[in-house]
Swiss-Prot record:
Positions with a binding annotation for Mg(2+): 201, 203-204
Protein known as: Ribulose bisphosphate carboxylase large chain
Propeptide residue span(s): 1-2
Modified residues (Phosphoserine): 208
Cofactor binding note from Swiss-Prot or TrEMBL: Binds 1 Mg(2+) ion per subunit.
UniProt GO molecular function: magnesium ion binding; monooxygenase activity; ribulose-bisphosphate carboxylase activity
PROSITE patterns: RUBISCO_LARGE
Length: 479
């Protein structure tokens, strides 16, 4: 042993490895109002006790490392360390546990989702002592929430900008998603908007490819917006995807959209990254643009029940980072989505205060302290027969987005848009008259078909279409 090492040992530094639970498992800890709280689904390797696994998560996502280091003595671990303060079993899963971890607020940079996630969902997810790890929920304290701008505008400001109230908004993703020229793309946008939709949308992978450069697309879509507005007397929009290979290029595209006078742009927030998304959100607030968010890549992160991150966490992160709309599944369409879980994170997107409710997957009470809300977007494999269920599930503060369910109409895009608008108006009127959409939905649609040939044709085309597959990511305790 060198003299230097002997000196360190003689003043209290004890080298070596000790169990994480001796430092980071603190069941007596009382959480603070300023703590960020996390609920992890932990699957320990065989032979690893749940207390050690939970403590390892707390350590490796905060101040700990695999061995004792002498620099621990140069700071206050009690002030900065994460703490596993409670562990509970998962019903029906012998090898899984929910570990609750509290993080001191000083561990995180203000206004940075990037920094928060780098710690909480960083290297710890590759830790060998864990067979699997999933972040189920986060409690963001008001003290941290107040360091974020959040959505550029929010639900009420968007409705005021669009002058549209008392119903869900209607959208359509232009198909085929790739391969159209800019002029043909703009024509498809125009037909949908003049038929009665509020919005059309770039698909998430439409950026600036050889068949359609972004500037050309923006110009033809702006022409479609202005022409359809003049004909219908309604404010229209198209989600112009500003996502690009660099933040500088992304902002350049948003600037051009603003110069064209269009109301909304779009970003792929997971593939683009949280830093880019927050930058774009700030630009949109400063320049009066709404911001639509697509969640491409989310299922890589959130679909498996025992590893990754639940979408409710990604939804909370988006509300902090900023976006006025975000795709949130449909429950009834072609994409994965458990009903109760979906309703839970839809409330987390829209409401100012959400109580803990484990029956909907909400582990913590969340106070958003007046941070603007986000409109959930229902999109993916939906058509006119789904309209009653969508209206009942998502309510007025939502965007119902039909891609193939508009463009697949046998008579073309505009009649497809008419069919969706008629179906929506019929459902809203029936609901306002006190009818039960869950029970009478099909009857309501059939009645509307009698005076709308466009809706009748759509109903005939999609009458047999179902996406009846079991949900992979169910809430605990569901069969």
């Amino acid at each position: 042993m060198s003299p230097q090492t002997e000196t360190k040992a003689s003043v209290g530094f004890k080298a070596g490895v000790k169990e994480y639970k001796l430092t980071y498992y603190t069941p007596e800890y009382e959480t603070k109002d300023t703590d960020i709280l996390a609920a992890f689904r932990v699957t320990p390797q065989p032979g690893v006790p749940p207390e050690e696994a939970g403590a390892a998560v707390a350590a490796e996502s905060s101040t700990g490392t695999w061995t004792t280091v002498w620099t621990d003595g140069l700071t206050s671990l009690d002030r900065y360390k994460g703490r596993c303060y409670h562990i509970e079993p998962v019903p029906g899963e012998e090898t899984q546990f929910i570990a609750y971890v509290a993080y001191p607020l000083d561990l995180f940079e203000e206004g940075s989702v990037t920094n928060m996630f780098t710690s909480i969902v960083g290297n710890v997810f590759g830790f060998k002592a864990l067979a699997a790890l999933r972040l189920e929920d986060l409690r963001i304290p008001p003290a941290y929430t107040k360091t974020f701008q959040g959505p550029p505008h929010g639900i009420q400001v968007e409705r005021d900008k669009l002058n549209k109230y008392g119903r869900p908004l209607l959208g359509c993703t232009i198909k085929p998603k790739l391969g159209l020229s800019a002029k043909n793309y703009g024509r498809a946008v125009y037909e949908c908007l003049r038929g009665g939709l509020d919005f059309t949308k770039d698909d998430e992978n439409v950026n600036s490819q050889p068949f359609m450069r972004w500037r050309d697309r923006f110009l033809f879509c702006a022409e479609a917006i202005y022409k359809s507005q003049a004909e219908t007397g309604e404010i229209k929009g198209h989600y112009l995807n500003a996502t690009a290979g660099t933040c500088e290029e992304m902002i350049k595209r948003a600037v051009f959209a603003r110069e064209l006078g269009v109301p909304i742009v779009m970003h792929d927030y997971l593939t683009g990254g949280f830093t880019a998304n927050t930058s774009l959100s700030h630009y949109c607030r400063d320049n009066g643009l709404l911001l639509h968010i697509h969640r491409a890549m989310h299922a890589v992160i959130d679909r498996q029940k025992n590893h990754g991150m639940h979408f409710r966490v990604l939804a909370k992160a988006l509300r902090l980072s900023g976006g006025d709309h975000i795709h949130a599944g449909t429950v009834v369409g072609k994409l994965e989505g458990d009903r109760e879980s979906t309703l839970g994170f839809v409330d987390l997107l829209r409401d100012d205060y959400v109580e803990k409710d484990r029956s909907r997957g909400i582990f913590f009470t969340q106070d958003w302290v007046s941070l603007p809300g986000v409109l959930p977007v229902a999109s993916g494999g939906i058509h006119v027969w789904h309209m009653p269920a969508l209206t009942e599930i998502f309510g007025d503060d939502s965007v119902l987005q039909f891609g193939g369910g508009t463009l697949g109409h046998p008579w073309g895009n505009a009649p497809g848009a008419v069919a969706n608008r008629v179906a929506l108006e019929a459902c809203v009127q029936a609901r306002n008259e006190g009818r039960d959409l869950a029970v009478e939905g099909n009857e309501i649609i059939r009645e509307a078909c009698k005076w709308s040939p466009e809706l009748a044709a759509a109903c005939e085309v999609w009458k047999e279409i179902r996406f009846n597959f079991p949900t992979i990511d169910k809430l605990d305790g569901q069969a």
